[in-house]
């Protein structure tokens, strides 16, 4: 644990020790607060067919008659054993649902993540290189507009243009109707992936473009770039060489830290495109009062986002050595409020109060 | 004698003017710097010393116009035949280790550059090559900046305020380093307001008063009360520096 | 009254950057007021179901066309925007208020400070939209649910910023003197902290607002937000899917464009205010500078 990333990992692990339990408590509390009767959600329309005794029996069987904190520890104990409970809406263990749906989400989010990074940082570099001229204005305006456009609206527009008017691409699902996973060709899969990835990645480029542009301009206008330019380095070389470390290094960090946003976008995108991933399951769980599934998904995404942030921190310190934690670096002891300051202040103010006549 | 004649950086009537103004900011300045010599450039704050360096490198702000003739061995002066050591250590790239920065500047050099040897030349350990700028002390950072100018292989160095913010011992060492470079045949234009250290290395000193070149004096003139200096401003500048020197050395012990 | 008018006019007509911000702010305030008032005052007949005029393309009579039930899209968009703006305003106000309280509490009390920073860290560590869904779910969805969801999830960044500002204020001499004179924390917060934090607070509100309405629309879109029978942008877009697949593109274009334009205006205003009132925030997790919401 002598290297800087070892110290970083230790620091982050210590954080996780209190962060994860606190998060689990918060999530569980939120789900338990919901004014939805789980029994009713489970039984659904047949509620009228069961009497109050049967209802109480089901509640007892699920442990719903117990106080909240007992239910929490019950849930936690099962969680530690890898049991996340049963999903009501999919009629299967939550873990199975998660494992089944994770690959589709991973494909969608992974492709979007990469596409957004390539396009976003490319446009950002271009904008910085043309600072103040029309390509820069165009790209900046574009970034601004998409960062305030509702992502799901962009998806609907794409469907309207590419799927309905032009009829180039499919608008629904991961595969053509009637084709099973085994029969499918990879290109069928790919064709269905295009529109969701386009939607999701466009949404992610907005902040990235602005960030890369800002960082690169900051470097190119800064003293060290000026110094290199004075000694004969060309602007292109400057932007692609030393500048890339300034711009892209932090771009990776920002992009990784925005994985949570990406997942949020995928919830909407998967709903619109009927993509069989975790996002679609989230909506189904939330609207179908499927508390165990909702909790499970929330936990998975929290872990993914934490990992993303950890990776972002490591990369940030790798790119910028000023962020590395050095062993000799000790936090200065916080200055205690000085008692004499208190006393003298009181004295001063008291004397002033005496002199000033009261009106 | 003829080679001496050939190797010189000559500036005639260098005048810097703010666009739309008739009064020049700096100049007209004229000087001639020979290889293996050091020309000092002094003046009060805001006299336009750093602008002169920018003018040599054709890197003036857009609103300043530059007139005059700058030649190197009678050919027009190219910025690429000189190297600048800037005033601020911000000029170091914060995200690159020293060795990598040396390589960036060495790209211009026709000869292969060994970073370790270069670091040794500015009296830095080879280990310093792996350090990032934020890990360097002020004196080390200045030496790295000097190493960067050497990496370019340029024969003409423009050194801007090398001792600013350094403590006296470190500043003296840096000046010592500059005289070694001078002895190796580099032509040095040394911009500083630290006249006392300047005359330890310079052969001639050019004095600016609010942008005007009032005098170019040989170092020998800076002696005693400055009787050898022609212009009253030069004398005042010299006396002021001497006056501050003495009380400072007396009081230094009492301060802490 | 006259003096107020005169000072407003003199501020708005300033030719510098600040004047530009004030003009934009005044313009956005007028737009929002008109929309909320206009959306509420629309006669019911404008939005009534009219089977004779189903799915008409935009024309002089129906500027933005009609939907599958023959309702005028322009009126519905306006009414939907009014609804979204109302929820957004309330949620953003609650959120910034929460941020203010949290920030001041953290600055004035050390143990509360620890609590607030852990809570902030935790909230920022969670995927934003999932948290929104969870809170909306906890409140059982609907207009109430979505308002609370947005209000309870958008405060952390602003709270972190206000906490930082308040902490430097608390360290200053005059606050320390007041404290040693026996003033209560409440008094300090009201007289020393709040007036100084006002600019950041207002800037924070404007920055949060567009996010609030966008997230409200997102939640309504997936069915966890505003009730389906009320006009709202999210619900309208969710219902437009079938009409759009049938080729009636105008049912999609109008509501989204309206929402985007309002959000765009506030984003621009927020950008200006942020530059003027908020210092660049350099978080440890590489959050882009100045990002508040």
Predicted feature residues:
Chain A
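Short hydrophobic, aromatic-rich alpha-helical segments embedded in or entering the lipid bilayer
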Residues: 49-81, 273-285
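Membrane-interfacial helix-loop-helix junctions in multi-pass membrane proteins
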Residues: 59-68, 85-90, 94, 176-193, ...
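Hydrophobic alpha-helical transmembrane segments of membrane transport/permease proteins
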Residues: 20-70, 166-186
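Membrane-water interface segments at transmembrane-helix boundaries in multipass membrane proteins
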Residues: 141-206
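Alpha-helical transmembrane segments of integral membrane proteins
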Residues: 2-7, 20, 98-135, 151, ...
């Amino acid at each position: 644990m002598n290297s800087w990333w070892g110290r970083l990992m230790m620091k982050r692990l210590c954080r996780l020790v209190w962060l994860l339990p606190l998060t689990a408590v918060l999530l569980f509390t939120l789900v338990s607060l919901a004014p939805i009767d789980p029994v009713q959600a489970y039984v659904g329309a047949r509620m009228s067919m069961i009497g109050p005794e049967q209802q109480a029996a089901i509640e007892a069987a699920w442990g719903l008659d117990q106080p909240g904190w007992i239910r929490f520890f019950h849930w936690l104990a099962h969680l530690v054993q890898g049991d996340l409970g049963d999903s009501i809406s999919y009629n299967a263990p939550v873990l199975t649902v998660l494992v089944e749906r994770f690959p589709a989400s991973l494909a969608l989010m992974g492709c979007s993540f990469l596409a957004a990074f390539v396009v976003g940082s490319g446009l950002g570099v271009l904008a910085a290189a043309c600072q103040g001229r029309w390509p820069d204005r165009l790209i900046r305006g574009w970034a601004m507009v998409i960062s305030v456009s509702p992502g799901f609206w962009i998806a609907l527009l794409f469907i309207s243009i590419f799927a309905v008017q032009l009829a180039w691409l499919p608008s629904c699902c991961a595969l053509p109707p009637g084709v099973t996973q085994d029969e499918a060709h990879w290109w069928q899969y790919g064709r269905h992936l295009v529109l969701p990835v386009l939607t999701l990645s466009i949404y992610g480029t907005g902040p990235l473009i602005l960030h890369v542009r800002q960082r690169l301009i900051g470097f190119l206008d800064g003293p060290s770039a000026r110094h290199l330019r004075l000694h004969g380095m060309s602007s292109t070389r400057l932007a692609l060489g030393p500048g890339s470390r300034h711009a892209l290094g932090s771009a990776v960090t920002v992009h990784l830290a925005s994985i949570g946003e990406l997942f949020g976008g995928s919830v909407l995108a998967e709903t619109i495109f009927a993509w069989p991933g975790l996002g679609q399951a989230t909506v189904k769980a939330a609207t179908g009062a499927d508390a165990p599934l909702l909790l499970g998904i929330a936990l998975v995404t929290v872990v993914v986002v934490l990992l993303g942030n950890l990776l972002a921190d490591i990369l940030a310190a790798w790119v910028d050595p000023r962020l590395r934690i050095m062993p000799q670096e000790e936090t200065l002891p916080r200055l205690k409020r000085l008692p004499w300051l208190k006393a003298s202040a009181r004295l001063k103010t008291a004397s002033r109060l005496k002199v000033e006549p009261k009106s | 004698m003829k080679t001496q004649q050939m190797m010189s950086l000559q500036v005639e009537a260098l005048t810097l003017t703010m666009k739309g103004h008739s009064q020049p900011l700096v100049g007209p300045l004229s000087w001639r710097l020979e290889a293996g010599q050091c020309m000092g450039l002094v003046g009060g704050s805001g006299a336009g010393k750093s602008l002169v360096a920018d003018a040599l490198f054709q890197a003036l702000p857009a609103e300043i116009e530059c007139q005059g003739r700058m030649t190197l061995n009678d050919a027009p002066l190219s910025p690429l035949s000189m190297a600048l050591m800037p005033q601020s250590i911000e000029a170091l790239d914060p995200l690159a280790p020293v060795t990598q920065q040396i390589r960036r500047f060495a790209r211009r050099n026709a000869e292969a550059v060994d970073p370790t040897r270069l670091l040794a030349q500015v009296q830095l350990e080879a280990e310093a090559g792996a350090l990032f700028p934020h890990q360097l002390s002020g004196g080390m950072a200045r030496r790295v900046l000097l190493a960067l100018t050497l990496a370019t292989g340029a024969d003409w160095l423009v050194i801007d305020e090398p001792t600013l913010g350094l403590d006296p011992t470190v500043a003296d060492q840096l000046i010592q380093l500059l005289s070694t470079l001078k002895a190796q045949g580099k032509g040095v234009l040394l911009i500083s307001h630290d006249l006392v250290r300047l005359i330890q290395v310079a052969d001639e000193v050019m004095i600016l008063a609010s942008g005007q070149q009032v005098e170019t004096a040989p170092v020998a003139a800076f002696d005693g009360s400055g009787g050898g200096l022609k212009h009253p401003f030069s004398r005042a500048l010299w006396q002021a520096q001497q006056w501050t020197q003495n009380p400072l050395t007396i009081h230094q012990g009492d301060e802490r | 009254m006259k003096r107020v008018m005169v000072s407003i006019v003199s501020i708005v007509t300033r030719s510098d950057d600040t004047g530009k911000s004030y003009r934009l702010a005044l313009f956005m305030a007028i737009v929002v007021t008109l929309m909320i008032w206009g959306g509420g005052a629309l006669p019911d007949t404008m939005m009534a179901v009219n089977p004779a005029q189903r799915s008409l393309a935009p024309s002089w009579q129906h500027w933005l066309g009609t939907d599958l039930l023959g309702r005028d899209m322009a009126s519905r968009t306006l009414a939907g925007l009014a609804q979204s703006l109302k929820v957004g305003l309330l949620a953003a106000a609650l959120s910034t208020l929460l941020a203010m309280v949290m920030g001041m509490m953290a600055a004035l009390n050390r143990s509360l400070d620890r609590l607030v920073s852990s809570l902030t860290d935790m909230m920022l560590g969670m995927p934003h939209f999932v948290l929104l869904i969870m809170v909306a779910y906890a409140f059982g969805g609907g207009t109430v649910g979505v308002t609370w969801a947005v209000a309870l999830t958008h405060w952390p960044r602003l709270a972190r910023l206000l906490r930082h500002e308040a902490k430097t204020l608390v360290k200053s001499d005059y606050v320390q003197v007041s404290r040693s004179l026996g003033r209560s924390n409440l008094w300090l917060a009201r007289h020393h902290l709040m007036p100084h934090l006002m600019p950041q607070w207002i800037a924070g509100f404007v920055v949060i607002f567009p996010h609030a309405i966008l997230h409200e629309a997102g939640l309504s879109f997936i069915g966890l937000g505003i009730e389906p029978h009320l006009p709202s942008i999210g619900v309208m877009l969710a219902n437009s899917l079938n009409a759009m697949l049938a080729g009636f593109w105008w049912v999609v274009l109008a509501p989204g464009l309206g929402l985007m334009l309002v959000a765009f205006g506030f984003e621009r205003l927020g950008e200006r205010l942020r530059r003027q009132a908020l210092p660049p925030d350099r978080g440890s997790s590489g959050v882009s500078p100045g990002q508040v919401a």
